[in-house]
Structures are given as C-alpha cells and as structure tokens.
Amino acid sequence: MAKSWINDRWLTDAVKILDDGSKVHVPPSSAVKRALSMHMDDPEKAKVPAEFRTSVFGQGSRWTVFWTADGERHRKNFRDYRKADEFRAGLEDDIRSARYVNPKDAERTFGEVAEIWIAGLRGSIKQSTEARYLRELRIWVLPRWGAVPLGRIGTAAAQRWVAQLVSGDAPRDGRIGQARPLAPKSIRSVVKIVFKAVLDLAVSNGWLSANPVEQVKLPRAVPVRRRVYLTPVEVKVIADEMDDDNAIAVFLLAYTGVRIGELLALRCGDVDLDRMTLSVSKTQSVDVNNRTIETTPKGNRSRTVPIPEGLRAGIMQLADGHGADEYLVRAPRGGMQTTQNWRNRIWSPALRAAGMDEIDGLTIHSLRHTYASLAIKAGADVKTLQAVMGHASAAETLDTYADLWPNRTGEVAAAINQEILL
C-alpha cells in the first residue's frame, strides 16, 4: 500500500532547548494557523513568529501532497488545504482500486502514444484501412489532441470536440475554422475508432486509468442517402455513351453486382465461361501513400459470382487476345485502370452526355444497387443475395435492401388458410 501525507511548506515546529540540553519540538498553535489561513493572500499580516516560519514562508503554494508508489516518491503542490486533502484521498482510493496512474505517465502526450499505436497498426490490418485511420488521425485527431497530456484528456473536453466536429469548427490539419462539418458516420470513425484506440492503448499500458471516450455521446446518424435503382433501359442509356469495352464494364457492374474496385481488379483468368462465373478475390484500394493497390475484398471474403448468359459475348470481347494474368477491364494503354480514373474519365462524362448527371444519389455504386433490385425481383432470397454480393451477414443485406422485398403477408395468410382444419 502506498503511503501519502500532506506537508505544510510555510509552517514548521519551533525547536526549544531545555535546561538539560534536550530538544523539544513545539508545533504552531491553533491561533497561529487560523491567523495564517485568514491572510493567505498576504501572509505577513498573520504576524507568524519567526520560529514557526520555514525558509519558503509565503512563497508559492502552501501545501504539498507527498506519496510513494511504484518505488518512487511523488509530490503535488496545492494552495488550498481542502483541495490537497481531496487529492490525497482520491489518490489513495485510486491506488486501492488499481486505478492509480504514475504522474509521469499522465504527462505523456497523446501524440507520443499515437506514434506507438501507429507502429502497432502496420501489418495488422488491411493497407486501405490503415490508410483511412492514419488520414483521420492526421487531419482531425492530432490537430486537437496531439500536444495534450493524457492526464488532461477528459470526457467533457472530448464531448466539446465532438460538437466542434459537427459544427465544422474543429481544428483540422493544424488550422482552425475550416468550416467543414463531419457527417455522423465519419465522426464515429474519428472518435470511437481512431481517437478511442489510441487512448485504449494508453489504458492497457497503465498510462490512463480509464478511457474518457467511453462516455462520449455521438450525433445520431442521418438517413442514408437515397439509393438509386436503374432500369435496364437507363443502364443502356449510360452504356451507350461509352466505348464498347467500357459499356461492357457497365453491364458487368449492373448485372453481376460486383463493386467497381472488384471489377477493375479482375483478371481474364478470373472468368470461367464454362460455368459462367467470376472469381472475386481482389479489389482496388489505396495505401498510406495514396497509391492504388490491390487487396482482399471487403470483409476479407472471396466469392464466386454468377454471370448472366447475355454477357458472354461482351466478356469474350474484353478477354480476346489477352492472357489469363491480364486485366479484364484495362486502362487505355493496358495495365491497371484505377477507380478514380474510370470515374473521372469514363463514368462522369457518360452521365453528362446521357443527361443523367443531375440525378440525386446516382453513383457507380448505383449499378450494384440495381443488380440487387433485379435479383430480388427475380426471386432471390436473402442468403443467396448475401453470398453473391459479398455482404458480411444476411442482416446487412436485409438492412440495405429491406424495402425491395415485397410484402407477402397476405400470401402467407392465404397459404395457411388452405391448411386449416376446423
């Protein structure tokens, strides 16, 4: 058990020498202490006898809390005795309940701990996820908390920061007042994933007694942006504004449900025209240096996707004359076509040419939603659609497309009615 005590820096015992030569320590009287307490702003007015004064009488804070823990002696000064006593009591309670944090550790800055956290990230998660975390750390977290000691990060301050993220007043990239509000989904990632993860590391190392982010409240999620489901006619209108190869790419997106990054990572060898399937095992992403890379699909799950017969000729056209290791959808000069280039140079110009660029919510991902709507219309059940689209769970599929499944409660009642025996 650690020992703690409070020391009066201004007053000391007077030493009296008796006739026999022995020494007696005489503490200051209650009257002396009361007088000094009444004149803390001007100690000389208390008229404390010199014999009770220390060498630092009237200088700095009057009270010092001393304690020993982890084999070291520590101290903290206070002007007010009650605050010193409250600190000492809380200190001993923290030690008894294993919440004690060495003051030196509490003075570590958030930025110092973040560097350790970053080192632990490398190789433990996908490069694209690492890149997103580091970007959020650099843009939003470090500008506010990088230089702040761990011991000064509290729930109230973190909650005020969340309010700034919502309003757009939070420091960003070291600059203040950029007027860029964050969406609730982004705030959750910045606060409850990145910021919290660094503080979790501090807690696990004993540098913080508890994570102040645990009690922080986040803004409620806003309704998901309206999903756009295209008709086959609308898909063709867009494809008709592209060259033949990219038109086939649009048809693949709309009628197989693969993501754009997955499509652009497909090799010719990933296509099996005997079984009419695509083997989706890679997708495009970006690394910490913002370079396009290939990684595993979302959720680290590979899958096999069926190809409608109507796409056979188009796929054969894309693969004609190209080896199994070559990309199925290629850049104009061959090689990898990046998602950004395809969006900027192929997709967006085609939308403008088709007069569809002002449709709210229409993105490349709308082609994937279109596939889901057509599959459900064709009778696909939840588990089948989940497997084809690569969702993490059937619940995700339901949450995303629940509005597309028809309400068949009437049919159920009619079917059960046929079984009733009265």
Describe the function of each predicted region:
Residues 171-174, 236-247, 256, 305, ...:
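Short, basic (Lys/Arg/His-rich) helix/loop patches that form interaction surfaces
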Residues 1-119, 123, 131-135, 139, ...:
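Basic/aromatic DNA-contact patch characteristic of tyrosine site-specific recombinases
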Residues 59-60, 173-196, 204-266, 274, ...:
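Basic, Lys/Arg- and aromatic-enriched nucleic-acid-binding interface segment
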Residues 81, 221, 284, 389-415:
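Catalytic-site neighborhood detector that most strongly recognizes the C-terminal catalytic loop/helix
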Residues 240, 275, 284-313, 317, ...:
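C-terminal secondary-structure termini that scaffold catalytic or DNA-interacting sites
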Residues 69-74, 93-103, 115-128, 138-225, ...:
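N-terminal core-binding DNA-recognition domain of tyrosine recombinases/integrases
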Residues 270-277, 361, 380-402:
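Short, polar N-cap/turn motifs at the start of nucleic acid-interacting alpha helices
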Residues 110, 114, 126-129, 133, ...:
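Hydrophobic (often cysteine-bearing) scaffold residues that line and stabilize catalytic clefts
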